[in-house]
């Protein structure tokens, strides 16, 4: 399940939200980002979500494009739903489908009492047991939590832990500051558990910057993400 996020080479965005609970208005997010790695167009990421009456629904599509798309046709889709209160998400279901051009696969997670149950769980030496991951969120919920439109007092306030069915990781946003007409955040993705010793030795922390811009209705939306990845410098820009 990690591929929906890690395929970007963008630090696998994701994520129990521990940031202070704020009063967030019901609303919707509909964003399309171009993805470029080392200046080469790699594809697009679409993130959609809505919140109403304490519930949320979110979906995303990651698809290869540009020169990368000529080499490999890759498409990942995911959806998630659950409850939301302020900045705290409690997922109830997550579904993912992947088409790598060579094979197709699907996976899902459901939650009971905040504990995930994985459809394709297979125990292994590095695999984190789902029964130990109470309070974590799925990759799509994590992505939506990081990329949704927010009020000004919620900008750069995120500290979430994610479980993808095998691995546990964390994403933090902090230090909001003006950068031209946008607000810049410092972010970090951290591998926590379930990764091989080689992966941890190679790199366990991935810094990035996220940029918000003010919208016509006075809220703030993500316009750009910049990071250094194992694949080179990566930039996501909102279309």
Name every feature range the model reports, one short phrase each.
Residues 1-9:
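Bacterial N-terminal signal peptides that target proteins for export
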Residues 2, 21-23, 122, 140:
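Intrinsically disordered, low-complexity regions of eukaryotic proteins
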Residues 8, 22-25:
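Compact, aliphatic and Gly/Pro-tolerant "microcore" segments centered on a short helix or tight beta-hairpin
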Residues 14-22:
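C-terminal segment of classical bacterial N-terminal signal peptides
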Residues 25-113, 149-239:
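Acidic, serine/threonine-rich low-complexity disordered tracts
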Residues 89-145:
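Surface-exposed, polar helix/loop patches in the mature regions of secreted/periplasmic/lumenal proteins
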């Amino acid at each position: 399940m990690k591929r929906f996020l890690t395929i970007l080479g963008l630090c696998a965005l994701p994520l129990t939200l521990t940031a202070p609970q704020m009063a967030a208005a019901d609303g919707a997010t509909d964003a399309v980002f171009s993805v470029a790695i080392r200046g080469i167009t790699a594809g697009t990421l679409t993130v959609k979500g809505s919140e109403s009456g304490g519930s949320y629904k979110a979906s995303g599509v990651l698809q290869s494009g540009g020169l990368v798309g000529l080499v490999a046709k890759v498409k990942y889709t995911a959806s998630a739903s659950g409850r939301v209160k302020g900045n705290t998400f409690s997922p109830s279901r997550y579904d993912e489908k992947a088409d790598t051009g060579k094979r197709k696969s699907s996976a899902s997670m459901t939650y009971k009492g905040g504990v995930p149950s994985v459809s394709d769980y297979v125990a292994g030496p590095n695999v984190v047991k789902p029964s130990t991951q109470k309070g974590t969120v799925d990759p799509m919920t994590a992505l939506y939590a990081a990329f949704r439109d927010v009020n000004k007092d919620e900008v750069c306030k995120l500290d979430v832990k994610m479980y993808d069915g095998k691995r546990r990781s964390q994403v933090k946003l902090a230090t909001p500051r003006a950068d031209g007409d946008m607000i810049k955040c410092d972010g970090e993705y951290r591998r926590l558990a379930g990764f091989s010793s080689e992966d941890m030795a190679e790199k366990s922390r991935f810094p990035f910057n996220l940029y918000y811009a003010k919208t016509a209705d006075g809220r703030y939306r993500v316009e750009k993400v910049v990071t250094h990845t194992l694949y080179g410098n990566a930039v996501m820009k909102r279309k």
